């Protein structure tokens, strides 16, 4: 990141591009990368604009805890404006980027253009289904609060449906959770599911034993 920040200056800009005004750095994305870039520019001789389609910064490493009902969404989200409130040279725009006019040096939103001298694109990454895009229709990613609350609803609903079922095979199916991906998020989610089943839900049901739930 420090190497990136070093390149955000007026080097290579023509006098017409800067003139007598302050350099304007536009950052698309208010995730870890975008906010780190913005805060590194706190003392810079220029103005910073952060654009994001959501008004909050999300601590994604703890999304699995929201998905398993250990935390609420508010516990892992903070207002972007609040984070940058004391940074005098920073401005925040809530909006979705529809395009970039490279020649005209402008970021395009639905109803406005935001001119820039330097542009940082920090929009993050999407889920990978390892070449099996059909999985997207039957599963949920874990990148946003909406993803986490959807997953939480599905998990808790599976226990409820298992409680209502008289079919042992149906119960087994409902209490089996498949996790695609064995990285930190996948491993932590599997552990949190086990904790949910064996501790939080262990005594909540009459007809099923939540501790028999399995993840793979």
Language model features with spans:
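Beta1-alpha1 glycine-rich phosphate/pyrophosphate-binding loop at the start
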Residues: 2-93, 98, 177-178, 184-216
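FAD-binding core/adjacent interface of flavoenzyme oxidoreductases
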Residues: 2-23, 90-178, 196-201
């Amino acid at each position: 990141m420090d190497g990136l920040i070093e390149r955000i200056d007026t080097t290579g800009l023509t006098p017409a591009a800067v003139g007598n005004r302050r350099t304007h750095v536009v950052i698309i994305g208010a995730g870890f990368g975008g906010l780190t870039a913005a805060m590194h520019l706190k003392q810079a001789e220029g103005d910073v604009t952060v654009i994001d389609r959501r008004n909050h910064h999300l601590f994604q490493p703890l999304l699995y805890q929201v998905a398993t009902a250990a935390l609420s969404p508010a516990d892992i989200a903070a207002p972007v404006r609040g984070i940058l409130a004391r940074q005098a040279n920073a401005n925040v725009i809530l909006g979705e980027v529809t395009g970039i006019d490279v020649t005209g040096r402008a970021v395009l939103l639905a109803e406005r253009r935001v001119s820039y001298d330097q542009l940082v694109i920090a929009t993050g990454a999407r889920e990978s289904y390892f070449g099996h895009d059909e999985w997207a229709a039957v599963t949920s990613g874990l990148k946003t609060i909406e993803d986490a609350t959807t997953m939480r609803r599905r998990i808790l609903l599976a226990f409820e449906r298992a409680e209502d079922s008289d079919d042992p095979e149906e119960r087994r199916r409902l209490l089996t959770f498949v996790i695609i991906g064995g990285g930190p998020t996948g491993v932590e989610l599997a552990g949190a599911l086990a904790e949910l089943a064996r501790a939080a839900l262990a005594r909540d049901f009459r007809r099923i034993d939540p501790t028999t739930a399995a993840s793979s």
